[in-house]
UniProtKB/Swiss-Prot annotation:
Record: residues binding ATP: N55, F56, S57, H58, R95, K181
Protein residues bound to K(+): N55, S57, D88, T89
Pathway membership: Carbohydrate degradation; glycolysis; pyruvate from D-glyceraldehyde 3-phosphate: step 5/5
Subunit annotation: Homotetramer.
Name of the protein described by the UniProt record: Pyruvate kinase
Site entry: Transition state stabilizer: K244
Known cofactor(s): Mg(2+); K(+)
Length: 504
């Protein structure tokens, strides 16, 4: 593999241009004050945006409702590919209290003070006593451990656990004691609930408004995912849950989380505070690889093109970061402040689009397909066997596309797992599935609007002919090209068992 990889890399086209090429990965953009506008959303979609992210750490329900409404209106103006909407929860968190008169108190290194969970100090914090709103902090932390305040801007070492409400700490560096700052406990297992009351209300808002996915913050165990499913209920059962891995517990318990979740986000911001920064890229690679083998979509997020918040061009390191996330196997890459508050949102999406396309063309797909196939657990279920066979057939036949006649998107996800080097056209009547299939690398939704006919095989042929016609019109394939198709033997999801090779 290494020799084949080296040989492949030496033959890359270094003059590759991204013009008029289908991008396999998807782009997620956070919508904020700079971009919450119908015309702006249309322009972002034309630049390559696939999934709208709403950050529920900020904004009112009225504001988020306007994002949803504007996103839907943008589709009425510009059809393009269906747009998915994601709700990113605030998540359970630990914060400091309120300082006296809301002042900032400067401190120097080696400054000793008290951290307390005593509510009497919740609004009386200063440079002597700071309230922490996590009641069990004295039970879970140990002397010698570090506490980060304000995303690690200020660090404290725990000197002594004085009693069940009090810690004696010493500052590691200079900084300021301020109101309502986030608190991180790196290397310490915490027992916070999976969802705060705000999160539960936010998720119910999302269910009511038909969001397509939940980005669930600070997931620590598989049980956290189960709790979110309970809140989603029957009405929200089709909403995809994406587990954000942001702490050491999430990394340690990743295998059980992966079983329960629909997908994963490698959320490198808080993760880089909770674990040493040099370890983040190793965790990123491991988590993405595990997701690829499990056929679970994975998103790489945080600071990908951050300098483009205020600059029209990214740093070279940022471009490499985006490209390497694609090479690692990420299905989606995400923009945060770049599109939420940045001065160059269109340029950021366009830069990510172009970088992703070029990175995708640097991948040796067939050796990757062969490796994933060799690692599959045997015997494979029928649908996965068909998905695997369709990709192998596409390589053997030099097919130009794989057409999946799909109800739920499940088969398309499995086809994506086996890394085809051609587009996967998911033909479906299911509008929701067409939107969340953006999570799967290389899968393109084609919504078939015509009603079903009684004869099943006739309905299959109608959808296939329509898909071929659409693909030819879009320039994805040419008449006479070989294509591989997957279909079921009967109506409904979970019945895919037929693979064919046909001519366009």
């Amino acid at each position: 593999m290494s020799n084949a990889s080296l040989s492949w890399l030496t033959k890359l086209n270094t003059s590759e241009t991204p013009d008029k090429v289908l991008r396999r990965s998807s782009i997620i953009g956070t919508i904020g004050p700079k971009t919450n506008n119908v015309d702006v959303l249309v322009k972002l979609r034309k630049a390559g945006l696939n999934i709208v992210r709403m950050n529920f750490s900020h904004g009112s329900y009225e504001y988020h409702q306007s994002v949803i409404d504007n996103a839907k209106q943008s589709e009425e103006i510009y059809k393009g590919r269906p747009l998915a909407i994601a709700l990113d929860t605030k998540g359970p968190e630990i914060r400091t209290g309120t300082t006296i008169d809301d002042k900032d108190y400067p401190i120097l290194p080696n400054h000793e003070m008290i951290f307390t969970t005593d509510e009497a100090y919740a609004k009386k914090c200063d440079d002597k006593v700071m309230f922490i709103d996590y009641k069990n902090i004295t039970k879970v932390i140990e002397a010698g451990k570090i506490i980060y305040i304000d995303d690690g801007v200020v660090s404290f070492e725990v000197l002594q656990i004085v009693d069940d409400k009090t810690l004696k700490v010493r500052s590691v560096n200079s900084g300021k004691i301020c109101s309502h700052k986030g608190v991180n406990l790196p290397g310490t297992d915490v027992d916070l609930p999976a969802l705060s009351e705000k999160d539960k209300a936010d998720i119910k808002f999302g269910v009511k408004n038909g969001v397509h996915m939940i980005f669930a913050s600070f997931i620590r165990t598989g049980d956290d995912i189960k709790e979110i499913r309970k809140v989603l209920g029957e009405e929200g059962k089709d909403i995809q849950i994406i587990a954000k891995i942001e702490n050491q517990q999430g990394v340690n318990n990743f295998d059980e989380i992966l079983v329960e979740t629909d997908g994963v986000m490698v959320a490198r911001g808080d993760l880089g505070i909770e674990i040493p920064a040099p370890q983040v890229f190793v965790v990123q690679k491991q988590l993405i690889a595990k997701c690829n083998l499990a056929a679970k979509p994975v998103i790489c997020a945080t600071q990908m093109l951050e300098s483009m918040t205020y600059n029209p061009r990214p740093t070279r390191a940022e471009v490499s970061d985006v490209g390497n996330a694609i090479l690692d196997g990420a299905d989606c890459v995400m923009l945060s402040g770049e599109t939420a508050k940045g001065n160059y949102p269109f340029e950021a999406v366009s830069m990510m689009h172009n970088t992703a396309i070029i990175a995708e063309k640097a991948i040796a797909y067939q050796p990757l397909h062969n490796e994933i196939r060799s690692l599959a657990n045997r015997p494979t279920p029928t649908t996965e066997t068909c998905a695997m066979a369709s990709v192998s057939a596409a390589y053997e036949q030099d097919a130009k596309a794989i057409v999946v006649l799909s109800t739920s998107g499940f088969t398309s996800r499995l086809v994506s797992k086996y890394k085809p080097n051609v587009p996967v056209m998911m033909v479906t009547r299911n509008h929701r599935a067409a939107r969340y299939c953006h999570l799967y690398r290389g899968v393109y939704p084609f919504v078939y609007e015509k009603k079903t006919v009684d004869n099943w095989q006739e309905d299959v042929e109608n959808r296939l002919r329509w898909a071929v016609s659409e693909a030819i019109d879009l320039g994805i394939i040419k008449k006479g090209d070989s294509i591989v198709t997957i279909q079921g033997w009967t109506r409904g999801s979970g019945h895919s068992n037929t693979v064919r090779v046909v001519q366009a």
